[in-house]
Amino acid sequence: MKDFKKLYFAIIIILFLSLNSCSKTKTAYLPYETAKNINSILVLPFEICSENSESFFYCPVREVISGYVEPSAKETLNRLLKKILSNYSSHYNFIFLSENEFENIISQILEETKNPAEIIKELCKKTNTQGVLYGRIYRFIERKGSSFSIVEPASVAFALVLYDGETGKILWMEEFYETQKPLSENILNIKLYGKLKWLSAEELAERGLIKIFKTFPLK
């Protein structure tokens, strides 16, 4: 039995290394005519998807199922996003709005228009930016248990959208939705999970951000 376990983990490690070496994502770039006009990007605080609240941002997600969102989800994802974006500071200047700053600006804009594209344009005008990065949280459920033994796994779902400040149109969008599963159900998930343990919701969200930002368009 011990020899079998050693063989099992050896196979997992080999698969993990081979997946890392064979699946390099090609860097995405904005079209020149668009990229030359974008120097600063306004980063909005994450918004929670709720049946009871109205969103003024167009976010055409395809397969995401909404669920419970932990009270700490917004703060956690805002912090993780800021950390990820620091890797792209040589390409763009990121302007981060606090919740209060965003509410003050958006309330002024909504007095004039509720058109999603026009809202994007006005946000950029008021902040002297050329693009807007918007995030929406659909699900953020903490695991029940420890990293080695769980009752229920962590489950996270969110989307990020980059809008062009000149036209209000979407330049880039990615969504991430994942409920951690045992590696015995899908060995390919070892690349996402990274370790042979049960992740917290924050750890799963951070891995999700790293994954989707592999396609973030540069200039």
What are these regions (language model features)?
Residues 22-53, 123-127, 139, 150-219:
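C-terminal/domain-edge helix-coil "capping" segments
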Residues 1-9:
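Bacterial N-terminal signal peptides that target proteins for export
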Residues 10-18:
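Bacterial N-terminal signal peptides
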Residues 27-28, 118-120, 143-145:
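Short structured motifs
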Residues 2, 147-150:
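Short proline/glycine-enriched turn/loop segments at secondary-structure junctions
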Residues 104-106, 140-145:
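Short, solvent-exposed loop/turn segments at secondary-structure junctions
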Residues 66, 70, 108, 145, ...:
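Residue-level detector of alpha-helix boundaries and kinks
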Residues 47-136, 165, 169-173, 202-203, ...:
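N-terminal segment of the mature soluble domain
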